[in-house]
Amino acid sequence: MEQVFSYIISLGASVMMPIIFTVIGLCIGMKFGKALKSGLFVGVGFVGLGVVTALLTTNFNDPLKAISDIYHLQLNVFDMGWPAAAAVAYNTAVGALIIPICLGVNFLMLITKTTRTVNIDLWNYWHFAFIGAVAYFVMDQSLLWGYFAAIVCYINTLVCADLTADRFQKYYDLDGISIPQPFCQSFMPFAIVFNKLFDMIPGFSKLDIDAEGLKKKFGVLGEPLVLGVIVGALIGWAAQLDIKKILFLGVTMGAVMELIPRITALFIDGLKPISEKTQELVKTKFNGKKVHIGMSPALVIGHPTTLVASVILIPVILAIAVFLPGNQFLPLASLAGMFYLFPMILPFTRGNVVKTLIIGLVTLVIGLYFVTDMTPDFTLAANQVYAATGDNAAHIPDGFSGGALDFASSLFGWVIYRGVKLSYVGMGVLAVITVAMMVINRQRIVKE
């Protein structure tokens, strides 16, 4: 069983998701050709996203490291990026069976009416395995604690996916879709709180500028493409590169800003037919009861506000991280994942660039402290995995500790981590919160 699921994970999202979507399409009554085409569109989307992400990391890692060296921005925690966190997640006893265990929990929640989300985003299950793996090592390699932490994270993420589904679907015009990805969902509470605070500030509501408004106000300078070129060139200039390389970095960042929306359109092309068929099936067979298909946030990271906020925050957070009291983490490798901060913020800010930027900055600053706090046990887990498997993704350079924005900067991950550190008292508190969330969600589902 363990080898089967390890093999499935090794296929990667670009192969795994087309197979899953083709099977789902056939199960809900789509013709084979249409189901296969939908699945392949999703797979091509993941391939394209991988190419663009590689374009960003390959070309910007060295300039960002050069900036760090030139201006003496070295901090003690080495940014290993999400691949290290995923390596820690899947190279432990917890990660080996995380998919069947979480699918089982999902099934039980569906039949007990404590969720409406069917989480088919199997690739992102590594997030649950990661917090489980950290708990596993914190508690002296206890599988009980590892699976407890993973399941608590999974259940609360499913509930949050349900709670945000209507707002998400309305804002992005994606019927029947929810986002059960804990990294994205953990920014949702910040979006709710700060959005309400902004509305209480006299005159703040007048700063209602979305990405389209930015274009009207600043003309071509408000375009994500042009903003990307400017920020990319500024990074090259700060790294003291020659004019040729500065221009190349500018065009490369601009290309990333332009290509991501086109690639995410492929996800929508693949998902739309399956989503529509699912809603049709639910209406005819299940008396109109709602069912949400849990998907990756990659589906919506091409939104113009997400692109604008991400490209502006990359240099800003790099500068702030150095001078932040008590912070030991300098985000470099993780910056390519900046786009994933915003999918669950935008439905609450309604795409307002100013609100989104401020919320994104605040959550990132808090996230840096979360990463710093989790560093000792992230390092312990990574070292144990590297010693056992030799996986280079988990190798921490000499003289450094290890960390990553995704998933160590997440509110969900940090709260569970801190709960585990409190031992059985923390377990009790986490269990009560989780059960309460399930009860609240069930009451909503039964009422509707």
Locate the predicted segments by residue.
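C-terminal TM-helix exit segments that contain a strictly Trp-centered aromatic cap at the helix terminus
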Residues: T53-N61, F370-T379
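Signature of multi-pass transmembrane helix bundles
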Residues: M1-V52, A93-H292, S296, G302-P304, ...
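Solvent-exposed, non-transmembrane amphipathic alpha-helical segments
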Residues: L56, F60, S68, M80, ...
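Membrane helical hairpin/interfacial module
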Residues: G45-A96
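Mid-membrane cores of alpha-helical transmembrane segments in multi-pass membrane proteins
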Residues: Y71-V77, L97-L103, W123-A129, A150-Y154, ...
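Hydrophobic alpha-helical bundle architecture
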Residues: I111-T115, G294-D373
